[in-house]
């Protein structure tokens, strides 16, 4: 079958059919002899209780194991953020960005392995992952969300953890006139500069012509100002076996290795230790404007046919500004205090310098726009009593692009060269940095150093056609069947304008001191840190000063002073102090993924000894072709520009490559449900599912970092031939629906997963660049002055001032072919492993409404275990599953006499969130986190339809902390604060 012909002919046929049924000759009049219906009073339960009843009914009547969340009323979802609502479901946990729910993990499988659909349609994403960002969509037009934890043949593939279907409102589902408007003010306590921001939304739904035609129009606009405080260890921690030191002459050294002497409790030879690359304090402000809109048109000329045309629009503009202060460790001779092994970490890590080093203070100001649209058409046709058909087609696109004169990411650095030593105490939650001379730094000391202006544009397009049918065999059985064609096109482009003047340019007095207001650091954090008590015999001056300088003023001054006359820069402005839109000069990647699928499912319902049961046996076939074309920047020289940085010089040329991959799977599924006693359901299921690799992993081409170090460079390469993860799934569940809005459930799940994707580090001499830190001059300097990078560079400047590869005024040493060894790049390449990993767990939930009191509670707990955990003692990548953690929720609610109140406690245990840092195969663990949210609303009796409400998130100001192989190896601590909103909602 020709897929293109199928797409066109089916769509054309369906549209013709819709037009045809509207023709007077085909649309016969309603039966005039129909009996007049008796008037029956229908009581509709809304609010919290109504939402819980509807969700419980959906769960009870499902063909597999499923959880659901339903709107409390039209246009009113339990939370303003969908991810915040989803985390209340058993086994679901979320990731937050700037304090707001963003992505979900289900049963230990991270966002990439949970397929999110909108009305059953796959949605495009622009992050290179497969995870949908729930922060982009408003909940105002959402009718419900279903989380399918077991697979059915009719479900699309891609979700090993779950398939999450977000369902939007449809006018014919709620006939009549409906109109809702709401307004709110949001106070985000995480920002010191912002103020209360508005949220407005409106929804109009109506049906006409005896409910045969319906229209729904909804829109929302939200502004939000937020901020956060971060403490980071930059690119991460470098890990070594204890035998590694800084003795290059003995052959036991690696870059970052600590001396054998002058240490307290130094790790032994067979232990593993880690050293930090830097310590950074970062203070960020963010402004967001989110716009959502949806138009739905429905036409049902007869009871047996219904056509739906819908368009959904989402836009999220995010502007970010930040200031930071940092001290980069140069791995000069260090003196440190260590924890006990076998995984050893510094309680205090310190370095002392012969020459003063930089105390860096950077700033950024940039913006991005995320924009997406989806146009869909759906036709449902009950052909006769036995056969019903559904056709669905949509074309959707999403784009992420710069939305600022400074690009999608910008960084400009200044520095005062005052640092005589640097030390960090890692004994507390907050890393505490001490810098010799740091608190005495003045605005006059600051000089402009390096800068990066980046522009990234990512676009994803999905065209999907689905044809489904249901054929009834008899009263007990029917067959579901269908075919689909899905094409996903991803295009990612990026270009950087980078200055590598990290040694500083200009002179004192170039920058106006009034542009550099000083502020203190530690009063901005609530987390506690150490006080260097583990280090005896020396006092440290804890850094408590940062210049919160204005990005634009310094950028403009630097552009004016440090752009040579006649110089043509790479930026669109003609200098190197702005971004470029010349994507053709840098990285350009295009990937097409085309999937064809077909399924058949047999459904059987009967009684066994008076106990109703249903059986669903299905088979799904998936065939996928991947084509990736890439063009990446090439480099022709390596320049040693600072103690710890070797910059790569772009040649202006690009390398082109096209790669392909394909795979196909036959995926069975069995779901069995029986009401073993009245109101008690037992369920059992077996299925085989796949989870496709993220889009970045299947992109072709090798991209290297533009900054290397003395040990070489790094980079990454995609692999279009990657296979999906494969999982054999076993599920069992028992559910007791003992009262209205009340149930108790327990479930067990087991997943045997193969084809785990791991990153192999491959040594490559790509570009054949001479390494200036690995050659004749370097070895002579090493023998003369030792391993300190600053001393080595100064020795080369002093002894080779006339060498063409040595630029003494510019403080640059370039690689020299024939004299220096070729630079080695560690290239991360994803590949499928042969290991099998078993993930299993238990889920427990109780939902109870206390009669007519109005009180109720929801309690759930999920335990997840893996047969293979990350081994912190192994220094290479491992096939460990990220996102695996236990979770719990406690929700108390009250609803009576127009008053609704809810308080929710959410907890997630520590979990592995990544198997790699920028320094290589070093793990990242997100520590256990809990959050308390609350909301209260009141229906004003004086004005029918008017509700006022108050919401509060993260009431106790919890923060998120990430560490490496040990708790002391902090990578990131982020404090995002609490958020409050007050508003009113009017429906009529």
Q: Where are the model-predicted features located?
A:
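Outer-membrane beta-barrel signature, preferentially recognizing the C-terminal barrel domain
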Residues: 370-372, 591, 661, 690-747, ...
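N-terminal periplasmic accessory domains that precede
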Residues: 82-85, 102-105, 117, 133, ...
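Short acidic/polar hinge/loop motifs at secondary-structure boundaries
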Residues: 121-149
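Gram-negative outer-membrane beta-barrel transporters
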Residues: 752, 757-762, 768-916, 956
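Conserved C-terminal beta-signal and adjacent last beta-strands/turns
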Residues: 6-9, 14, 28, 452-454, ...
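Extracytoplasmic beta-strand/coil segments of soluble accessory domains associated
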Residues: 83-122
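Transmembrane beta-barrel wall of Gram-negative outer-membrane proteins
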Residues: 194-334, 367-378, 383, 388-389, ...
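N-terminal periplasmic "start-of-domain" segments of outer-membrane beta-barrel proteins
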Residues: 44-75, 103, 111-114, 121
């Amino acid at each position: 079958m020709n897929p293109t012909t199928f797409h066109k002919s089916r769509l054309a046929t369906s549209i013709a059919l819709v037009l045809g049924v509207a023709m007077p000759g085909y649309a016969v009049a309603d039966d005039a002899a129909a009996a007049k219906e008796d008037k029956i009073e229908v009581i509709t339960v809304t609010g919290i209780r109504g939402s819980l009843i509807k969700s419980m009914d959906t769960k009870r009547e499902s063909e597999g194991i499923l959880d659901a969340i339903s709107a409390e009323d039209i246009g009113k979802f339990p939370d303003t953020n969908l991810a915040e609502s989803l985390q209340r479901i058993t086994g679901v946990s979320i990731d937050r960005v700037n304090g707001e729910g963003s992505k979900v993990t289900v049963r230990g499988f991270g966002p990439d392995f949970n397929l999110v659909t909108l009305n059953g349609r796959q949605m495009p994403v622009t992050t290179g992952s497969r995870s949908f960002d729930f922060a982009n969509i408003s909940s105002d037009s959402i009718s419900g969300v279903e989380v399918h934890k077991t697979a059915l043949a009719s479900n699309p593939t891609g979700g090993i953890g779950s398939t999450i279907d977000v369902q939007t409102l449809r006018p014919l589902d709620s006939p009549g006139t409906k109109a809702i408007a709401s307004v709110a003010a949001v106070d985000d306590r995480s920002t010191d500069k912002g103020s209360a921001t508005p949220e407005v939304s409106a929804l109009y739904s109506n049906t006409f012509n005896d409910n045969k035609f319906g229209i729904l129009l909804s829109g929302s606009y939200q502004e939000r100002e937020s901020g956060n405080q971060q403490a980071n260890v930059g690119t991460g921690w470098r890990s070594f076996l204890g035998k590694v030191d800084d003795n290059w002459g003995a052959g036991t050294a690696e870059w970052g290795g600590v001396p054998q002497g002058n240490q307290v409790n130094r790790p032994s030879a067979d232990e593993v230790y880690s050293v930090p690359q830097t310590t950074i304090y970062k203070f960020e402000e963010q402004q967001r404007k989110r716009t959502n809109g949806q138009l739905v048109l429905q036409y049902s000329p007869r009871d047996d046919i219904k056509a739906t045309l819908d368009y959904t629009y989402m836009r999220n503009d995010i502007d970010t500004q930040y200031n930071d202060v940092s001290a980069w460790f140069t791995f000069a001779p260090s003196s440190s205090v260590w924890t006990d092994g076998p995984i050893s970490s510094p309680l205090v890590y310190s370095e002392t310098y012969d020459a003063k080093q930089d105390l860096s203070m950077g700033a950024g100001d940039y913006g991005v726009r995320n924009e997406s649209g989806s146009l869909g058409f759906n036709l449902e046709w009950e052909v006769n009593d036995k056969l019903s058909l559904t056709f669905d087609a949509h074309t959707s696109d999403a784009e992420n692009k710069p939305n600022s004169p400074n690009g999608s990411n910008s960084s400009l650095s200044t520095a005062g060269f005052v640092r005589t030593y640097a030390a960090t105490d890692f004994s507390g939650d907050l890393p505490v940095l001490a810098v010799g001379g740091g608190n005495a730094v003045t605005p006059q000391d600051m000089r402009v150093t390096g800068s990066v202006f980046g522009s990234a544009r990512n676009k994803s397009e999905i065209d999907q056609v689905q044809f489904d049918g249901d054929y009834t065999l008899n009263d007990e059985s029917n067959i579901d069947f269908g075919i689909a064609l899905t094409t996903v096109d991803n295009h990612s482009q990026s270009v950087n304008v980078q200055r590598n003047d990290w040694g500083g340019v200009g002179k004192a007095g170039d920058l106006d001191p009034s542009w550099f207001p000083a502020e203190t650091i530690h009063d901005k954090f609530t987390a506690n840190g150490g006080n260097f008590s583990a280090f005896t015999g020396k006092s440290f001056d804890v850094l408590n000063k940062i210049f919160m300088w204005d990005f634009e003023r310094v950028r403009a001054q630097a552009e004016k002073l440090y752009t040579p006359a006649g110089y043509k820069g790479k930026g669109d402005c003609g200098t190197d102090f702005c971004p470029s839109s010349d994507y053709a000069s840098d990285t350009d990647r295009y990937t097409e993924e085309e999937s064809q699928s077909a399924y058949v499912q047999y459904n059987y319902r009967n009684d066994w000894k008076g106990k109703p049961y249903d059986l669903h046996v299905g088979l799904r076939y998936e065939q996928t072709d991947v084509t990736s074309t890439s063009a990446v920047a090439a480099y022709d020289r390596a320049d040693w520009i600072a103690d710890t940085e070797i910059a790569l010089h772009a040649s202006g040329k690009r390398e082109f490559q096209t790669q392909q991959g394909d795979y196909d799977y036959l995926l069975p599924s069995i779901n069995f449900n029986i009401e073993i006693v009245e109101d008690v359901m037992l369920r059992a299921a077996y299925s085989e599912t796949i989870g496709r690799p993220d889009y970045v992993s299947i992109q072709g081409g090798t991209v290297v970092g533009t900054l290397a170090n003395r040990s070489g460079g790094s980079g990454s390469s995609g692999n279009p031939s990657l296979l999906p993860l494969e999982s054999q799934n076993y599920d069992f569940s028992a559910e007791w629906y003992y009262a209205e809005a009340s149930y108790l459930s327990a479930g067990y799940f087991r997943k045997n997963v193969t084809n785990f994707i791991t990153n192999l580090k491959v040594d490559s001499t790509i570009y054949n660049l001479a390494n200036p830190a690995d050659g004749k001059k370097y070895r002579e300097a090493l023998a003369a002055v030792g391993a300190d990078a600053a001393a080595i560079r100064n020795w080369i400047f002093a002894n080779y001032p006339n060498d063409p590869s040595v630029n003494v005024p510019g403080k640059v040493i370039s690689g020299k072919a024939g004299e220096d060894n070729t630079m080695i790049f560690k290239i991360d390449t994803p590949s499928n492993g042969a290991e099998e990993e078993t993930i299993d767990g238990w889920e427990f939930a109780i939902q109870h409404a206390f009669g007519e009191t109005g009180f109720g509670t929801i309690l759930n707990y999920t335990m997840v275990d893996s047969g293979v955990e990350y081994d912190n003692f192994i220094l290479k990548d491992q096939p460990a599953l990220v996102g695996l953690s236990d979770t719990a929720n406690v929700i108390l609610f009250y609803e009576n006499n127009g008053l609704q109140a809810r308080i929710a406690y959410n907890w997630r245990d520590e979990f592995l969130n990544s198997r790699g840092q920028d320094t290589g195969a070093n793990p990242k663990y997100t520590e256990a986190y809990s959050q308390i949210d609350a909301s209260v609303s009141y229906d004003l009796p004086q004005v029918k339809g008017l509700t006022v409400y108050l919401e509060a998130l993260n009431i106790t100001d919890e923060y998120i902390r990430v560490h490496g192989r040990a708790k002391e190896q902090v990578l990131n601590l982020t404090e995002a604060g609490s958020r409050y909103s007050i508003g009113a909602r009017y429906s009529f």
